[in-house]
């Protein structure tokens, strides 16, 4: 891929949809409070159902080099521009994989857990656990570690992309139902592929 893994200049935060667990705001506050992340741009994406949009808008407006996107159709571009994603499980993992975007992942629903654990096992994502169990300290440590580790980011991105390619090309979903259900969702989103 043409992606450069040298350093993290831009982070994409996209938890998906309404983010009822409040992880988006929590991540923003956490990142903004750390001087070490001051030079890193932040792109934050939420769905139109996101309830605390006023608070989030004010939070992001108060920090230079950060942008808020609500119900955007710019996702492919944002993924291409980012050097690291912090997101939830679910089908967006496959979109991130297609753009060689290394990801820190938090499960925000029970049904996301098996897929996240499986992709972590395969070395395709850095999975931090269920949102209720992920402390601020754990988030900060994981973000700091992955920002400082170019080889880890590249390995995650390349493994995720390779798995995506296998899942798309292999017509026999044998022992990996999680992988294939995810790939099928993305295969149905070919409009996303065409924008890459």
Annotate the PLM regions:
Residues 1-196:
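Nucleotide-activated sugar donor-binding and catalytic core shared by glycosyltransferases
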């Amino acid at each position: 891929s043409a992606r450069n893994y040298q350093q993290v200049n831009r982070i994409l935060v996209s938890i998906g949809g309404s983010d009822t667990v409040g992880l988006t705001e929590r991540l923003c506050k956490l990142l903004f409070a750390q001087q070490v992340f001051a030079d890193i741009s932040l792109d934050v994406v939420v769905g139109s159902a996101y309830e605390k949009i006023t608070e989030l808008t004010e939070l992001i407006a108060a920090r230079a080099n950060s942008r808020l996107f609500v119900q955007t159709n710019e996702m492919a571009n944002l993924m291409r521009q980012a050097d690291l994603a912090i997101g939830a499980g679910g089908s967006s993992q496959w979109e991130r994989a297609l753009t060689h975007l290394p990801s820190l992942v938090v499960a925000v629903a029970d049904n996301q857990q098996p897929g996240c654990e499986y992709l972590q096992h395969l070395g395709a994502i850095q999975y931090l656990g269920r949102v209720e169990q992920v402390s601020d300290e754990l988030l900060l440590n994981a973000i700091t570690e992955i920002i400082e580790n170019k080889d880890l980011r590249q390995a995650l991105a390349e493994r995720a992309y390779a798995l995506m390619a296998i899942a798309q090309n292999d017509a026999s979903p044998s022992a990996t139902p999680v992988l294939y259900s995810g790939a099928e969702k993305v295969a149905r989103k070919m409009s996303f592929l065409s924008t890459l």
